[in-house]
Amino acid sequence: MIDKYEDPFIRIAVMIGGDEYLKVARSLLKAEDATDEEIASSTGLRINMVRKVLYDLFGKSLISGVRVKDERKGWFVYRWRSRREEVESFIENQKKKIMGRLQQRLDYENSSEFYHCGNDDCQRITFEGALEEMFKCPSCGKVLNLKKNDKAKKAFGKKIDEIKKDLQQTF
């Protein structure tokens, strides 16, 4: 369980992956330059789960790993450390990705006319699809009518504006 006063690194880790990520993130903050075996023993998680979490966080640039030779075993091991300074840029990048996807969807909604039969179980169809089906629903056979998508366009536009405003305030 986390609270709103928890370290942002831990909060982001939980959002990405849940309880396993929470345990690994807390362990990384407690012990700088920890190996995956040390993290596994401190969290009680299996080593393969710890490695999965570490590789995912590493792929998102939220942690860094340094390869060193273990003097006792002679093997190379990774020592992991959190990159707390990267949390803000990670959040900013995620917001930009979401905003881009929303903008693509808004552009699609703006550039297309949609048709629907009125049955909740059936999907709406673009004009081209309706024309191919002779304006008959391919699922139920009812006549397809023009369906307004103003609500969807307004919702996408509003969310895009919220994210833009948030990005301007934060950065």
UniProtKB/Swiss-Prot annotation:
GO biological process: regulation of DNA-templated transcription; transcription initiation at RNA polymerase II promoter
Keyword annotations of the record: DNA-binding, Transcription, Transcription regulation
InterPro entries linked: TF_E_archaea, TFE, TFIIE/TFIIEa_HTH, TFIIE_asu, TFIIEa/SarR/Rpc3_HTH_dom, WH-like_DNA-bd_sf, WH_DNA-bd_sf
Domain HTH TFE/IIEalpha-type: 5-88
GO molecular function, one term: DNA binding
Superkingdom, taxonomy of origin: Archaea
Record keyword Zinc-finger present: no
Subunit structure: Monomer. Interaction with RNA polymerase subunits RpoF and RpoE is necessary for Tfe stimulatory transcription activity. Able to interact with Tbp and RNA polymerase in the absence of DNA promoter. Interacts both with the preinitiation and elongation complexes.
Family named by the database record: Belongs to the TFE family.
PANTHER family per UniProt: GENERAL TRANSCRIPTION FACTOR IIE SUBUNIT 1, TRANSCRIPTION INITIATION FACTOR IIE, ALPHA SUBUNIT
Domain writeup: The winged helix domain is involved in binding to DNA in the preinitiation complex.
Cross-referenced HAMAP family: TFE_arch
Function in brief: Transcription factor that plays a role in the activation of archaeal genes transcribed by RNA polymerase. Facilitates transcription initiation by enhancing TATA-box recognition by TATA-box-binding protein (Tbp), and transcription factor B (Tfb) and RNA polymerase recruitment. Not absolutely required for transcription in vitro, but particularly important in cases where Tbp or Tfb function is not optimal. It dynamically alters the nucleic acid-binding properties of RNA polymerases by stabilizing the initiation complex and destabilizing elongation complexes.
The protein, known as: Transcription factor E
Organism: Cenarchaeum symbiosum (strain A)
